[in-house]
Structures are given as C-alpha cells and as structure tokens.
C-alpha cells in the first residue's frame, strides 16, 4: 500500500470545524477596516528575491535564515513572501498608486518563514495587514492604533492585550545611536551570547530585542535610544502620545522596542499579550518613510501594521470562548414521502431567493424523519422546514423551531416572511 502523503511540517490544514471561527473573526476585522476607509489589495505570494533583500535588510534574521527562496526554470531567484509590506509597496510603485496620492490599503493571506514550528508560530501563517501611504503626521499613526484597538473591542479581548510604543527616530539618528550602542556592547563581548555577538556588528539594534535575560540585564546601563532622537522625531512621537492619551488608549513606552525589519523609522508599536505563553506579540507595525524610495519609487511616507491570524484565533479562543463561529446552517429542509425531493428543492430555491443571506441546507440521501432531524441538529440549524406528500398537495410547509420545539404550518407563499420574523 502506498505511503500517505502528509502536510509539510509547520504548514497546517484548517478543517471546516475551525474555518467557521476564522471566517467570523476575519469578517469582523474586514468590517472595521472598511469603516475606516481602507480598500483591499490582492498581492502575489511569490516575489523576486531582491525585493525582500532590499526592503527587509540583508542582515536580518528573516533574510538570512527564514526565507523560502528558490530558482525557477528561467534561473530567476524567487521567494515565497515572508511579510506583506514589501509586496504592497512594490505593487503601489508598479501601478502608480503612491506618488502625490493618499492610499489606505489592506491585504490578507498566507506568508512563509522557515522557523521552528510551535504553538502560534508556523512556517505557513496568515497575516492581515494595513498600509497607509502619503501621510506623515502622527495623527495617522494614532488612527491606525485606534483601528486595532477597535478590533480588540469587537473581538472581546481588550483586557488581554497591551500596547507598547517607541520611536526609533530618523535613519541618521539611528546610525548615531548604533555607534554608541556598539561601543557599549564591545565592553561586554565575553558576556554576550553568540546570537548577540553576531548581531552586534550586523544589526546591533536587534540586540535590544534579545530574549536572553543576561543580555537584557547588561542593557540596563546601555545608552538609551530616546537620547539620540532628532528633534522632528521627538515632536512626532510627542504628538502621537498626546493623541493616544486623548483617545483613552493606554500604552507603555518601551525604548527597547525596535522591530526586526530594517525599513522602519520613527513610530514602532506592538500589541502584546501574556495569555499565549512565549508567543506574546499579537499585532505590530510602524512607520517606513524611506521604503518607497528605497524600492525605486519617489519619496512617499508610509505607515502600517500586520497581525498573525493564527495567533489571534488562539487568543480569542483562550480569553473569549463566548465569541463563537456562526452556525453553518440556519435552516434545514426535511422531506419525506414519495416524489417529494423535487418539490423540496424548488421550495429551498424559493427561500434562498427571498432570503439571500440565510444558510439553508436541503436533506439529501433519504432517511426517515428521525435521521433527518438528527442531521439538522448536527449542522446546528435553528429551524427545520418539513414537507411531506400532504404538505405538497396542500401547498403548505411545516416550520419547526428546533430550540423551543414549537411548530406551525404556513403556506409556501408566506414561508419566507414567516422565516424572516423567526430569524430576526
């Protein structure tokens, strides 16, 4: 017997019992994005490798260790996208969407990173992200954060996430800080772990993000990034904090928050949780005013964020179990008797025409009433429509509320209006 082929490690199937909750969560997220004026953009999952090397940075963990890169049959180097911002910027430049224009875009889809699979961290994962181009003030940064805060309220998880905020300043200010940080770290090379030693010269700001408690202890006396900010970045950050204060959004300034991608400047933020163990980051983003020009476009400010859906689903399940998937079926149509199936299917189409948002499933495969009602219960139906030979002959249908057990007989012409009342 042939050996079963299984999914690749870290790339998961999501079965019907799981996707219903995903759909409800995604629907809520998309509704909020629409209410803020964002439009969807759909992007390829494969891009030219140089796009990510130029955007993310050649000495980042993502580019050095985590990308799925391969040569196609023409010898071109291609990469499965590890994040969404670079592709969104590439598309904006290619299609003339950015220069001297304001754009508010969102995307959703799979991303790929070769990491060690664990709960909340996978090799294929799904992100929803939003990007704003053409606006450089702190007000749009604040509105993006307010949008994410609305997401948490909609999902009932506001009490389980907290906002961390920082400014990493301009490229010039960050270069000055980098020199000061390296000079400080060089005094303690014997106390740094191997990863921090490597990062000290390739991407020293990433040492600030070390998970090693000994390294974090060393950093207590390190130069503070905030002391090296340029005046414009200080004013921008002060404006952002004032807007968040006015909106009642609580935050913590974390001067070690730097993000792992090279394109950020000024604002960086993360929403974090303590409810998912070590995988604490739920949503993260920041400002990238130089990225469009870096990728070949004209200078255009940008700011955005991305959120991993797998981690969000886990968080909702952990802290708000009352947020449940919508039922697969609202109405189940039960038919019994000789030559009733055709009439039942016509009735089902009539109801779907009149109530286009309603999920109606028609029984197929026969079975007595008991078996058909068991199927209705399995699918979570609230209402059963019952037609037999006598109902068809009289032009009627029995409507049964499966929760209360109450049932009534109505004409087929009035069944849609009756259902509309029952379903609210």
Swiss-Prot record:
Entries under Pfam families matching the protein: HGTP_anticodon (PF03129), tRNA-synt_His (PF13393)
Disulfide bonds: none
GO CC aspect terms: cytoplasm
Compartments in which it is found: Cytoplasm
Keyword Lipid metabolism applies: no
Self-association and partners: Homodimer.
The keyword Oxidoreductase belongs to this UniProt entry's keyword annotation: no
Gene3D superfamilies, per database record: Anticodon-binding domain, Bira Bifunctional Protein, Domain 2
Biological process per Gene Ontology, one example term: histidyl-tRNA aminoacylation
Protein name in the entry: Histidine--tRNA ligase
Lineage top rank: taxon: Bacteria
Catalytic activity field: tRNA(His) + L-histidine + ATP = L-histidyl-tRNA(His) + AMP + diphosphate + H(+)
GO molecular function: ATP binding; histidine-tRNA ligase activity
The entry's keywords: Aminoacyl-tRNA synthetase, ATP-binding, Cytoplasm, Ligase, Nucleotide-binding, Protein biosynthesis
Primary location: cytoplasm
InterPro entries linked to this entry: aa-tRNA-synth_II (IPR006195), aa-tRNA-synth_II/BPL/LPL (IPR045864), Anticodon-bd (IPR004154), Anticodon-bd_dom_sf (IPR036621), His-tRNA-ligase (IPR015807), HisRS-like_core (IPR041715), HisRS/HisZ (IPR004516), HisRS_anticodon (IPR033656)
């Amino acid at each position: 017997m042939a050996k079963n082929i299984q999914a690749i490690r870290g790339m998961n199937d999501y079965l019907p019992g799981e996707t219903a909750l995903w759909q409800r969560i995604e629907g809520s997220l998309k509704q909020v994005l629409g209410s803020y004026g964002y439009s969807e953009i759909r992007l390829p999952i494969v891009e030219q490798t140089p796009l990510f090397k130029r955007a993310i940075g050649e000495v980042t963990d993502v580019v050095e260790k985590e990308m799925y890169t391969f040569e196609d049959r023409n010898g071109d180097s291609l990469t499965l996208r590890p994040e969404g911002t670079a592709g969104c910027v590439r598309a904006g430049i290619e299609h003339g969407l950015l220069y001297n224009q304001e754009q508010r875009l969102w995307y959703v889809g799979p991303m790929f990173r070769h990491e060690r699979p664990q709960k909340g961290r996978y090799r294929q994962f799904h992100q929803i992200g939003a990007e704003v181009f053409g606006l450089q003030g702190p007000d749009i940064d604040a509105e993006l954060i307010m949008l994410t805060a609305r997401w948490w309220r909609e999902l009932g998880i506001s009490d389980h996430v907290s906002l961390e905020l920082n400014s990493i300043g301009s490229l010039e200010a960050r270069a000055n800080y980098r020199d000061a940080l390296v000079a400080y770290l060089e005094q303690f090379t014997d106390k740094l772990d191997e990863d921090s030693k490597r990062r000290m010269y390739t991407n020293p700001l990433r040492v600030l993000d070390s998970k090693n408690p000994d390294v974090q202890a060393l950093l207590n006396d390190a130069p503070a990034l905030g002391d090296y900010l340029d005046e414009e970045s200080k004013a921008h950050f002060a404006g952002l904090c004032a807007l968040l204060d006015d909106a009642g959004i609580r935050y913590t300034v974390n001067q070690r928050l730097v993000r792992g991608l090279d394109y950020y400047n000024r604002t960086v933020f993360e929403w974090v949780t303590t409810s998912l163990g070590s995988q604490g980051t739920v949503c993260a983003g920041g400002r990238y005013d130089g990225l469009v020009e870096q990728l070949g476009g004209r200078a255009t400010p940008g700011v955005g964020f991305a959120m991993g859906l797998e981690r969000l689903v886990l968080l909702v399940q952990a802290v708000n179990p009352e947020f449940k998937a919508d039922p697969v079926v609202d109405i189940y149509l039960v038919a019994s008797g000789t030559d009733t199936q055709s009439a039942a299917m016509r009735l089902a189409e009539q109801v779907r025409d009149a109530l286009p948002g309603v999920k109606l499933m028609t029984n197929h495969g026969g079975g007595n009433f008991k078996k058909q009602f068991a199927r209705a219960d399995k699918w979570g139906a609230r209402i059963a429509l019952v037609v037999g030979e006598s109902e068809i002959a009289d032009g009627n249908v029995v409507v049964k509320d499966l929760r209360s057990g109450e049932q009534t007989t109505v004409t087929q012409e009035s069944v849609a209006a009756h259902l509309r009342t029952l379903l609210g």
